[in-house]
From Swiss-Prot:
Residues 181-242, 265-323, 350-409, 429-501 form the CBS domain. Residues 1-14, 23-54, 97-110 have a biased composition (Low complexity). Involved in DNA replication and cell separation. One of its GO terms (molecular function) is protein serine/threonine phosphatase inhibitor activity. Keywords: CBS domain, Cytoplasm, Nucleus, Repeat. This is Protein SDS23. Residues 1-54, 77-140 are annotated as: Disordered.
Amino acid sequence: MQSSGSSASSSRHVSIVELLSTPPNAGVPSNSAAPSSSSRVAAQAQVQSQSQSPKLSATAAAAAAATADNFGNGNSNFGQAGAGTPAGSHIHHGSDAESISSISSASTTSMHCPLERTGSGTGSGYVPGPNSDVPISPSLSAVDTLHSHSVSRTNSESSFDTQLSRIHTTKWQLIPLSQLVEQNKLIFIDGSISVEEAFNTLVKYNLTSLPVENSPDDIDCLTFDYNDLNSYLLLVLNKITVNNPEVTRQCQLGHPVPVGEIIKLTPKNPFYKLPEQENLSTAMMILGSGVHRVAITNQENTKITGILSQRRLIKYLWDNARSFQNFEHLFQKSLKDLKIGVLDTHTKPTSRQSRVISIQGDELLIMALFKMHTERISSIAVIDPQGNLLGNISVTDVKHITRTSQYPLLQNTCLHFISVILDKRGIEMGKDSFPIFHVYPTSSLARTIAKLVATKAHRLWIVQPSGDTPVDSEKDKRSGKLIGVVSLTDILGLLARHQTEFKRVDPLAARRQRGSIV
């Protein structure tokens, strides 16, 4: 990737212009300030005021594989800051990552991808420790041996989670947010740096998102994530149109585009902030409404001290479930009994269920990226003509098509792309990798959460097993007919309604605000 002011920019830009002069014909149609919330009541009103239409859509986020041998192990959602911070990024207190390198200038006979990585890196947004996004294959045996009605797990081996286990009370709702903030550094990036540099920072620190500052100590900032990267890729490839002619022109000429401009193109929720003395109940209400992360500030609300993501919260509750009241009863119930995520094809979905969005395995990968953009989701199920689940494509998988040599993947099938991803994981891990991203309507909430923690996914697809597959068999890599999806939002919304004072939390509120549901 090219840093600002690089002398190699001109040749790279020529190669992009050559690419744009012969765009692939995939048949694709053209196409906030964050309010401060220190009060639970004010926060609830703010989130619930966004809820409008009942039409449904699937929640999404990047599905990454992770070791399941010890569900208590994991890294936080910010990526540890290290030496060699890329130009344009600077360290405050916590953030997310992955890397883009410069686009090599080549002959006009070669197709070029707008982003290209030069090296491997690890990183995922916002916290080093309990919420890392490092893609690692899960141990299927560990997932398979989970008893569907057991809340027992191995506690986290990290000193951070061990410390939390010693200090929290039996009422998780009263735990102050300060107890979930690690004193590690957050990584912020400046809005003036290029999209390539921003992607480099994501990769470097193995993050999924980064706060973008317009000025030093700006706490009312938007975030850059893989949805923005997907939009940028589609814009460069002339597959979408936006209402900013100058940004469109710069993208299609191959000129560097400030990340601060790109993040404005994708609808986002406000950057919610809660003071560190606020308790977990309020954060649960906001995250259970579909907001993916909240910023935690000091008492004066002048400085961000950490970020709490949906995945970090789920992992924290799972690691410490034995210490909390009233979890066992909910954890033993099935998804069907809880009425979350499961879609009955004979009845109309409720306003608290997610709509399944899928694509056929023989459709082109570029169409999957386009569909995720237009539906404003971050993952999509891949199915066969009979509706059986074949796999999953996440918006974070865009990182696998940032090299010039990987560009032909866009014009290949979704099923082929899934095989490429699995092969890549197998090479990196030295063994076969086949993370199980599905559950059944009869799967318990405990098993579902365990799989979400083990795979570091944001959602699991719900399938109806074939007649010859026992409904309680979790060891079979085969899935079944896709009938639904259950997400982190669904689960956090359920916990908020059942175990906090916020009984009317709507898991689709944030999606409506982003325009994902009309």
